């Protein structure tokens, strides 16, 4: 009887392990350009959540190449991915890969950047609101004068969502004549060096007569600040987003006005949970039907709430464990230090 009980227990254990393995999900993540600082945080959050859910993680980095991203998706599928999380380098170039996945009944999660294709699940922060927050912070600091708009990548739908939100805030002042836009440029690939070059050209064309810069993320803001600093231009309000450590340090130092914080830990966690649910054929909790893209394709979507971080509330990112105080306050003038650095 004892032997029979032991064998029964072993059989149950083996069956349980087999069942767990049978339902384990392989999640393939395609990164557009993993060299950017913030994606390291996203990846860790995705990995941690997948581990909690008993799923496994495989990934590929396109290194900024839309062509390589197509082959990356093929490779992830070949390696057994049952669901894909895709941070698209190019909203249009990625479509053949997304369509191929759909033909194989492999769900696709459009991560942070919109991919307009039927069946795609879209998860991001409210980018129109991010744009509003950026413009509000700059407008509060400089309600009149010459504005420069440094936009995101022309291949990323977020660039136009952000710009739309920014325009909502400053439109009335433009109409009134209080604000004049003296320069506006997209930033290929969201590259800081491209933003810096564009800003340098705008400074030259405007004769340095610039009062404020609405930059669409922290990378482009870094390029803007570098260009302004090189020309000896100080005290210009500059916006950004992502909560990059370098940007938060600039906010503490006073060279950047705001970084709209999109806690990538939340985005990564929720995207991983959505991916596993979709792979199991389940609905994603908290999702909504949305068709706000350029093509008006109806998608299931999930939007997270961003938080604008200025010198007044830098303590939030420290208390949240997003950045250490010494990194935040490095090089800050003690006489001008924000409360978070005292």
Feature annotation, model-predicted:
Residues 10-12, 22-23:
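Cleavable N-terminal signal peptides
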Residues 17-19:
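N-terminal signal peptide c-region/cleavage motif recognized by signal peptidases
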Residues 1-9:
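Bacterial N-terminal signal peptides that target proteins for export
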Residues 2, 22-342:
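A residue-level marker of the well-folded mature domains of exported/periplasmic proteins
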């Amino acid at each position: 009887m004892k032997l029979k009980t032991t064998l029964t227990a072993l059989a149950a254990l083996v069956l349980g392990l087999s069942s767990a393995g049978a339902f384990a999900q392989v999640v393939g993540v395609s990164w557009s350009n993993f060299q950017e600082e913030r994606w390291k945080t996203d990846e860790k959050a995705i990995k941690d959540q997948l581990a909690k859910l008993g799923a496994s993680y495989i990934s590929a980095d396109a290194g900024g190449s839309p062509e390589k991203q197509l082959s990356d998706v093929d490779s992830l599928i070949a390696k057994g991915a049952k669901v894909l999380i895709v941070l698209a380098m190019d909203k249009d170039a990625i479509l053949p890969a997304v369509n191929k996945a759909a033909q194989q009944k492999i769900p696709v999660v459009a991560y942070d950047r919109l991919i307009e294709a039927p069946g795609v699940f879209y998860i991001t922060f409210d980018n129109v609101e991010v744009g509003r927050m950026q413009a509000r912070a700059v407008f509060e600091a400089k309600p009149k004068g010459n504005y420069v708009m440094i936009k995101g990548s022309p291949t990323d739908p977020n660039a136009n969502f952000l710009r739309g939100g920014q325009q909502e805030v400053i439109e009335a002042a433009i109409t009134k004549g209080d604000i004049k836009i003296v320069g506006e440029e997209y930033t290929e690939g969201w590259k800081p060096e491209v933003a810096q070059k564009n800003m340098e050209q705008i400074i030259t064309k405007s004769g340095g007569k610039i009062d404020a810069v609405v930059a669409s993320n922290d990378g482009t803001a870094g390029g803007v600040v570098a260009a302004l600093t090189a020309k000896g231009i100080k005290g210009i309000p500059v916006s950004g987003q992502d909560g990059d450590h370098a940007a938060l340090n600039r906010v503490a130092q006073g060279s950047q006005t705001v970084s709209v914080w999109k806690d990538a830990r939340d985005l990564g966690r929720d995207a991983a949970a959505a991916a596993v649910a979709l792979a199991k054929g389940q609905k994603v909790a908290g999702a909504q039907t949305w068709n706000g893209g350029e093509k008006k394709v109806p998608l299931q979507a999930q939007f997270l709430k961003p938080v604008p971080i200025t010198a007044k509330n830098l303590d939030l990112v420290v208390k949240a464990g997003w950045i250490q105080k010494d990194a935040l306050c490095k090089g800050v003038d003690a006489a001008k230090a924000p409360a978070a650095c005292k």
